[in-house]
Amino acid sequence: MVATNLSYDHKPDSERERKRIEGGGGYVAPSRMPGVGFVGPARVWDRTRMFGLATSRSMGDTVYVGPNRSGVIAEPEVTSHRLDANDRYVIFGTDGVWDHVTSQEAVEIARRHPNPQKASEAIAQCARERWRRNGPMQDDITAVVVGLA
């Protein structure tokens, strides 16, 4: 069973999103700490440089949305995929999952757990374990497996 990605991460450092952000009046850079330099992931900054947002699309961060602000938009990416007899699952996950679990790994985990609830829990647990190995920080982790059979 092979994973098929139905979306891409809306992160400021992807070339596609960075160009769109810069065209919308924002710019992309990590946070800067005095005496330390740049830290953390790339962020979207508006002209005031008061806040940096680590995602390039958002429906709730309205301070970033609007003309000549930051280039952050609330417009979703919509894709389609024609199902065939080999498709078994749709797996949704937050960036806390996808930062540490590949799409193919998620498919393999789901295949080992026929119950969608158990598969969802196993994918989330895998992500949590990998976050813990990388230090004390952990992002939000949510996984949902929908069975198509």
Region locations from a protein language model:
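PP2C/PPM-type serine/threonine phosphatase catalytic core
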Residues: M1-A149
